[in-house]
Every structure is written in structure tokens, then in C-alpha cells.
Amino acid sequence: IRQNKVQLEALFYGMCGWLEEPVDSTMELWNREFRFLQSKFTLLDVRFSPKFSRLRPANFPTIRLSQLANLYVEQQNLFSIMIQNPDYQNIRTLLSALSASDYWTDHFSFGKMAQISFVKKLSPEFINLLFINCILPLQYFFQQLNSESKVGHIIDSYRNIPPEKNHIIKHWENLGIEFQNSLQTQAFLYQYKTFCKAKKCLNCAVGFQILKNAEQHKT
């Protein structure tokens, strides 16, 4: 199945419960393949429900799962490439070349033709997010598990990735903070989630100083 993209897509979409009412010939093909796999591997009748809300069409789970299927087919030694013996430029190159199947060139959702047709590839910004939130953390965990001392190399990799953009980072920027790389933004995201969101101002050097200054202004 790792060498059959149609079956991989059928497996992903079928386990999401999206193939039960096919509306075109491609969906019918995926549905047949999923029923075959379901019988062959005695798959449990469990359905996962990826979310579409608040996502841009290019980020829809339909597109991302197709790209994931393509990645599995094209890279049979994925763990070694991404985690065990990573070559960062090579990873970027293969991710940049990755695309969804032809069906999604003129679709975002099943059975609905899009107004604009284009090959669905990964954007540079999305590839950066994969490094920040997936590839580098897994590399760190793997090296810690195997007592390897390459943590500094991973930290340097974060320094070489541009800062990500999200609403939390935007709030920090509105306060005058300037970010040069993703190592800095990750530190401030940790700060927000660990202290600010949990209202642990007194346990935070920054929060404590702000409260201290506020108290001095009152007096």
C-alpha cells in the first residue's frame, strides 16, 4: 500500500468517513479501494473527523492528506530522511516538489469544481511550520532518546528559519518586540502559553516586573 497512492488516499479519506456517498467517478474509485482495504486488513469501523473550519482552502485536510499520501509513496525511507540522518536542504527540496493528486488541481472539496485550477503544492511558509512544529521536535526527541549530542545543531536550525506569523506573535509585535527567527518566536510562544495564558504572572520574571512597575506608579 505504501507504493500505491490511490490506495493511500482511499485509506485516508475512507477513515475520515468522506467516501460513503461518492459524487463523482474519482470518489467512486477511492470508495472501491477503501472497501477492498477494509476487507483485506479488517479495518475497524472508526471514523476520524479533521476540521475544515477557519482554514484556507489550500490548507483543507483533503489537500493535505493527498500530499501526505504522495510523500509516503515517493519517500520510502521517510524516517531516515527526516529524522535519523537529516539533510535540511534536501528535505526542503523534496517538500517543495510535493503536490496533491491531479483531482485536487481543480478541486478543494469533493465533487465541487474550483473557479481557479492550480497544482496544490506546499508553500515555503508551510514548510517552515513543518520544520518548527514537527521535523525539528521529532529530531530532538530522537537524539535525546539515543543519547546523541546534536541538540545544538537543532537549535541552530531554528535560528535559520524565519519567524512564524500568528495572532500570538502579532500581539508581541504590537508591544514593540522584533523577531529575527523562529527560535525567538518559539520562546515567546512558550512564554505566553506557560505563564500568560495560565495567569502565572508572579512566577514569571517579565510579569513580575510589569506588576511591580504598575504598583510603583500607583504610589
Task: Give names to the regions the model predicted.
Residues I1-T185:
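Hydrophobic, aromatic-lined core segments that form the binding pocket/scaffold
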Residues N174-T219:
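Acidic, carboxylate-rich catalytic segments that either coordinate divalent cations
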